[in-house]
A protein has these predicted regions:
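Core alpha/beta nucleotide-donor-binding catalytic domains of modification enzymes
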Residues: 2-124, 134-138
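Short catalytic/ligand-binding loop motif for oxyanion handling, primarily in non-cytosolic enzymes
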Residues: 23, 87-92, 136-139, 168-171, ...
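Short gly/ser/thr-rich secondary-structure transition/capping motifs
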Residues: 60, 159-162, 238-243
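Short clusters of hydrophobic/aromatic residues that line enzyme substrate/ligand-binding pockets
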Residues: 64, 89, 169, 197, ...
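Extracellular/periplasmic catalytic domains that process cell-envelope and extracellular macromolecules
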Residues: 73, 170-172, 250-253
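Conserved Class I SAM-dependent methyltransferase catalytic core
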Residues: 108-171, 177-180
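Flexible, glycine-/basic-rich loop-and-beta segments that form/coincide
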Residues: 168-222
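C-terminal target-recognition/interaction regions appended to catalytic cores
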Residues: 212-286
Length: 286
């Protein structure tokens, strides 16, 4: 490469892209997105809105051949990102199957991770990162993953367990990042709820902030949340191994609880549910 030539950016594809949180982090780090794959129509449309210049396929990953990806990318793929569904593995799911073997091989959603390994094996990227919940690697789950990646030529993989609140996320969030590289992340100052919510105007009044509008309480929340103390919840429900809380009133001086698929929160200073934008900020979306 000559001094006057343009340096090539590292490229990535995003499997199970959702609205694009994983892609956002990598593009902010200077990587170039080549393709996003997402089966959910609303999520795929949101991704396209967030990344208007990106190619988005609203398709089932099970039906996609790796050659199609290579043809679309028209160049080497450096990184494969993947966030397959966590429902088969999370302890918050009361219908989670009993053993890791059943979760990977009998649950159709759990088996999707093998389509990730199929594509990784075909594309041979410089590195891959698979994000999911920590229980995916419970007991035999870790050995199932190791054996699958040994089969496609990756003899050593790393199970990177990261507590995201130590790296700037304003809510407790323990995540697993499976990769062929060890992720060495520099800790950041913890952020409290007030640092990410209280600069927003009340959604009761007109504003031009995306997804920041007032949401009514559902009928199951008693007295529209009146009387709930900070840090306490109005609704409790059973997961596969523990009791979970919902409609928790946040404490602005603390971190938010772990956000799950159906988690909803009450504003710490106003008696109302959080807006969609406020909820996103608790997960460190801008």
């Amino acid at each position: 490469m000559t001094s006057g030539s343009k340096k090539r950016k590292f490229s990535f594809i995003d499997l199970f892209s959702g609205a694009g949180g994983f892609s956002l982090g990598f593009t902010q780090a200077g990587f170039e997105d080549r393709l996003a794959i997402e089966i959910d129509d609303s999520a795929a449309q949101t991704y396209k809105l967030n990344f208007p210049n990106s190619e988005v396929w609203k398709r089932d990953i099970c039906s996609i051949h790796s050659l199609e990806i290579l043809e679309e990318a028209s160049d080497e793929i450096d990184v494969v990102l993947a966030s397959p569904p966590c429902e088969p593995f999370t302890a918050a799911n009361p219908r989670r199957k009993k053993t890791p073997f059943e979760r990977f091989y009998e649950d159709p959603q759990g088996a999707l991770i093998f389509h990730v390994s199929r594509i990784v094996g075909d594309l041979s990227p410089k590195f891959f990162v698979i994000e999911n919940v920590v229980p995916l690697a419970d007991s035999d789950g870790r050995e199932i993953i190791k054996e699958e990646f040994r089969r496609i030529g990756y003899n050593k993989i790393h199970f990177n367990f990261i507590s995201c609140e130590k790296y700037g996320c304003p809510s407790y969030r323990n995540r697993l990042f499976i990769s062929n590289v060890h992720l060495d992340v520099v800790p950041q100052k913890k952020k409290k709820v007030e640092e990410v919510l209280l600069d927003l105007p009340s959604p009761s009044y007109p504003n031009n902030i995306p997804n920041h509008f007032r949401i009514p309480f559902p009928k199951q929340v008693k007295n529209e949340g009146i009387g709930i103390r900070k840090g306490h919840a109005d609704v409790y429900f059973k997961g596969s191994s523990r009791e979970n809380r919902n409609w928790t009133k946040l404490n602005e001086k603390e971190l938010a609880p772990t956000i799950m698929g159906k988690s909803r929160f009450i504003h710490p200073l106003e008696n109302r549910p959080l807006s969609v934008r406020e909820q996103a900020r608790l997960m460190s979306f801008p």
